[in-house]
UniProtKB/Swiss-Prot annotation:
Domain Helicase C-terminal stretches: 435-601
Subunit structure: Forms a heterotetramer with UvrA during the search for lesions. Interacts with UvrC in an incision complex.
Domain UVR: 627-662
Domain Helicase ATP-binding positions: 31-188
HAMAP family: UvrB
Pfam families noted in UniProt: Helicase_C, ResIII, UVR, UvrB, UvrB_inter
Positions of ATP binding: 44-51
Record note on domains: The beta-hairpin motif is involved in DNA binding.
Native organism: Streptococcus mutans serotype c (strain ATCC 700610 / UA159)
GO biological process, one term: SOS response
Name listed for the protein in its UniProt record: UvrABC system protein B
Main localization category: cytoplasm
Lineage: Bacteria, Bacillati, Bacillota, Bacilli, Lactobacillales
Amino acid sequence: MIDRKDNNQFHLVSKYEPSGDQPEAIEALVDNIEGGEKAQILKGATGTGKTYTMSQVIQKVNKPTLVIAHNKTLAGQLYGEFKEFFPDNAVEYFVSYYDYYQPEAYVPSSDTYIEKDSSVNDEIDKLRHSATSALLERNDVIVVASVSCIYGLGSPKEYADSVVSLRPSQEISRDQLLNDLVDIQFERNDIDFQRGRFRVRGDVVEIFPASRDEHAFRVEFFGDEIDRIREIESLTGRVLGEVDHLAIFPATHFMTNDEHMEVAIAKIQKEMKEQVRLFEAEGKLIEAQRIRQRTEYDVEMLREMGYTSGVENYSRHMDGRSEGEPPYTLLDFFPEDFLIMIDESHMTMGQIKGMYNGDRSRKEMLVNYGFRLPSALDNRPLRREEFESHVHQIVYVSATPGDYEMEQTDTVIEQIIRPTGLLDPEVEVRPTMGQMDDLLGEINTRADKGERTFITTLTKKMAEDLTDYLKEMGVKVKYMHSDIKTLERTEIIRDLRLGVFDVLIGINLLREGIDVPEVSLVAILDADKEGFLRNERGLIQTIGRAARNSQGHVIMYADTVTQSMRRAIDETHRRRQIQMAYNEEHGIIPQTIKKDIRDLIAITKANDSEVAEEAVDYNAMTKSERQEAIKKLQKQMQEAAELLDFELAAQIRDMVLELKAMD
């Protein structure tokens, strides 16, 4: 039994008060939610404090909230911000727990079967368990998730029904508790005490929940009765206090009881026989033999252990679902009246739409060649329309909402004023004739003032040629393209901010982490070439790169003004006029954002000081030196994760993978 708390209130902690047009945006969003409006858009310009507005709305409507971002890095940033805003509430993080993931696949042309291979991040697995258990225990929960939240997770009812509930004076034998823990996939290990494990010492059972990383619980028996339950430090065993009730959630999200397991196994065997008959009728004897062997092995594991590698492929049978019925996901763990907020919705909704098709084509190949039963096709992400069926109320958040969001609602709430008083940059169009000389002059003007320049081109070749030309002209310039790995990419951004060079050229500079306050000029070459990077949304996003500096300016080099250019320029000008009027009325002088330059590359010294060693050239290292560097980076990654700085942890993880690839 779970003691659910339904009356908790969200409490926002911040030294700031809503300013600019935040109060109006907050009031409008809250009124619409309380008035039963299903969908609305928060159209907020870059740097206007959209996350703070979202937090204010969550506090006022007091509903469990799911915030979806389009990648792990952005989800990590949002998680950190919400954690600061709501220290007294449950702020959870739910993303894919794979550091490395090679999905199961089959390539018929070379007769190559690729077995599923993955590396699970233990810290993220803990946070996923923390998210699901929090949703079942309390109402004041914010879960920040990636699109991983639309993938199959197991039945929330089975998960909740499997909870082992313990109280002092409860009549239960020690051995019964041990059996119950094994049933919910806990592992006994009296030596290595980790998450999802328990250990036994006489009449004392110590349990380490899957959702914790430092605190465990000590259950002390007197005969066949629980004498007391104490919370302890998992490492030292130091007692932290006594508890009146302990709910132990399963160590896996894919739970089923013995009765359901037998029914599921019968269905799996029936489906296997049908598939074998089908293959044999088509003369596919190898496929028939393959599916029989693989399924019989999995069934044996399920009978003996209650689990098998790839158990999720049998989730349709385990959950008792019909063919084609959507899987259970994180969304099913929320109560019916929860709130969804989609961050950067123009990107995220596209991802939600695309996940199903990519997964389906890979699995069909496995089914057709006898590696998986057809029911594996129902272990899948949700289709977009299935996602929509879970939506009670939703807020799309973006500076440039997509067509899909605009079709869902006419309710658009704008947030244009920045708390810093910064204006959207001035945008001008200049002809392509003589553009190189013109651009060179603009770059030198900025460099003399200690400011930086972004240049965006359409092709790799043009970016390379422009880099060579500017170098010949004495400009300190670098070029960033998609082939550059994380190690170099973070180094390049850091060097740009430090002034090691003045100009950064790229094809798509809209990726996360490219917010550089020192950039006062953004030059867009071939601005009149319509396409993905030169459509209205792409141009507005690119213009936004100059919105962090009080001297922000954008030059579009073009011979004609396209419809996309006109709309982007008009929208930027409209915002700028509103911002200028507000600043004048309130006596605000725009200030460039001050942002610390964090060293992501240098390996820190192994002492308590925060002084970093000089950046290291990893290519010049010997193999043993690289191994030592990997150990240091892994330690930093763990420390960053413990401090909940998942953005930094993810970047260090990528560096480690690249260093390993050098050997």
